[in-house]
Amino acid sequence: MTVSGTATGVRVRIAPSPTGEPHVGTAYIALFNYLFAKKHGGEFILRIEDTDATRSTPEFETKVLDALKWCGLEWKEGPDIGGPYGPYRQSDRKDMYQPYAQELLEKGHAFRCFCTPARLEQMRETQRAAGKPPKYDGLCLNLAAEEVTSRMAAGETTVIRMKIPTEGSCDFTDGVYGEVSIPWDSVDMQVLVKADGMPTYHMANVIDDHLMKITHVARGEEWLASVPKHILLYRYFGWDQPVFMHLSLMRNADKSKLSKRKNPTSISYYSALGYIPEALMNFLGLFFIQIAEGEELLTMDELSEKFDPENLSKAGAIFDIQKLDWLNGRWIREKLSEEEFQARVLTWAMENDRLKEGLRLSQTRISKLGELPDLAGFLLKSDLGLQPSDFAKIKSPPEEILEILNTVQPDLEKILEWNVETIEAELRAIADRMGKKLKVVVSPLFVAVSGSSRSLPLFDSMAILGRSVVRQRLKLASQAVAALVGSK
C-alpha cells in the first residue's frame, strides 16, 4: 500500500451523512482513518456530506459529531472547529461546485439530461424485466447544443450526467482488495448535479477530497463499485487521485449485513446502555490488528502502535455483542480506578438529562425516595428481561398485541425529531390508522418500554430513553409476545 502523501503529508477524512442516528459502522470507518493518520503522523479531518437535502438535518449532524467525540476521536479540521480548507459542510460549499460542473460540460465530459423521473422509472422496469441491471440508456447523451439551449430556455428540468467510456475496463489498485478491474460497460452515466443544483455524492466527494488535499480514501466496501466513476472524474479534471482502501462491511454473527433490524447499530444506543467509549473503540480496533489471545485489552495508543493496514482482511468484520460485553466488562474492572468508575457512573446517569428528567417525572408520583428504583429504574437498565408472561396481564389478546408492536416499530422510524410531542402525535396517528383506541395501542408499549404496565408517562419515557433504546426494547418485546402467541 502506498503511504506517502503530498507535500502536506498524509491526510485522511471521515465524511458521514447526517441522515439518521450515528451508526457504529461510521465509528468503525472513522477509527480506521484516525489510526491510519496517527500511525503515519498525518491529519484526520471530518467533513459533513449533506447533499441529500431531504434527509439531512442539523439535529442528526449534531448527533454525529457528539457520537464521534464520545468515541474519543479528535479531528484536526471540521465543521465545528474550521480549518484552512473549509467550509467542511457540503451544503455550505454549493457555489464552489458549479465551475467544475461547467468545466466538465465545456470539455465534453458531461452532458445535460432532460429525462423525467417517470421516464427513468419506466426505463429501469424494462431493463429489469429483460434481466439487465438498471442504468441510464443514454437518450440525452448526444443532444445537439441548440436543442439543449432551447429546452433549458423553455424551463425544462435538467440534471448533469457524466460520460462513461464504452469499451475496455477501469483497472486500479485498492489498498485492501489489490488489483481490481471493472468493465466500463457496467458503469452507469452517473448524475453529477441534481435538478436543484446540488452535486451528488460522487461529484462533491471527488472535488472536496482534491481541494482538501486528501491523500488516502478509506471507506466501506460498498463504494468499491463506484471507484471507476471517481477515477474518471480525477482524469477529467487532470488531478492526481488518492490511494483507495475499501474496508469489509461489519456483519452480524450469521454473516448478514449489520442492520438495526437484527442488532442495535446506533452509537447512542451503546452510550445509553453504559458501554464505555474506550471499550467500544478497543473492540472495533481489533478488526485492524493482529494479536495473540489474551492481548485484547488495548488503549487507543496501543491500537495505534499495533495498527497495520497491510494485513486487513476482506472477510466481513463480525460485530459480536457478547465479545463487546466481555471487553467492556474487562475495561470496567481492569482499567478504571474506583474514583474513575464512580465518576463514569455519575456522568452516564446524568447524560442527556436521563436521570434529571426521570426525577422530575417521579417527584409527584412517590411518597418515599425508596420507591424511585421501582418507578424509574427502567431508565437506567440495559436489559428489562422481558418475558412472555409480562404481557399476559394486558386485556388485548396476544395476537393483537403482536400486531400493535409490529406496526408501531417501522412507523416510529418515520419520526425526524424525537421528542414527547412527535412521539405522541405518531402514536395517535397509528391508533387512528389501526382503528383502535389510543389506550389499546399504548398498553403493550408501557410494558415494552418500562417492563411494567404502571410506570412514568409513556411518551416522556420514550423521549428520555431515546430512539435507539426504544427500538431495541420494542424488538425484544415483539419476540416475547411472539413466544406467547406460539405457546397457545
Curated annotation (Swiss-Prot):
The reaction(s) this protein catalyses: tRNA(Glu) + L-glutamate + ATP = L-glutamyl-tRNA(Glu) + AMP + diphosphate
Annotated GO biological process: glutamyl-tRNA aminoacylation
Keywords from the named record: Aminoacyl-tRNA synthetase, ATP-binding, Cytoplasm, Ligase, Nucleotide-binding, Protein biosynthesis
A Pfam family it matches: tRNA-synt_1c
Any one GO molecular function term: ATP binding
Entry-linked InterPro entries: aa-tRNA-synth_I_cd-bd, aa-tRNA-synth_I_codon-bd_sub2, aa-tRNA-synth_I_CS, aa_tRNA-synth_I_cd-bd_sf, Glu-tRNA-ligase_bac/mito, Glu/Gln-tRNA-synth, Glu/Gln-tRNA-synth_Ib_cat-dom, GluQ/Sye
Extent of motif 'KMSKS' region: 257-261
Enzyme Commission designation: 6.1.1.17
Subunit structure: Monomer.
Job description of the protein: Catalyzes the attachment of glutamate to tRNA(Glu) in a two-step reaction: glutamate is first activated by ATP to form Glu-AMP and then transferred to the acceptor end of tRNA(Glu).
Family: Belongs to the class-I aminoacyl-tRNA synthetase family. Glutamate--tRNA ligase type 1 subfamily.
Protein name: Glutamate--tRNA ligase
Native source species: Rhizobium johnstonii (strain DSM 114642 / LMG 32736 / 3841)
Origin organism lineage: Bacteria, Pseudomonadati, Pseudomonadota, Alphaproteobacteria, Hyphomicrobiales
Gene (UniProt): gltX
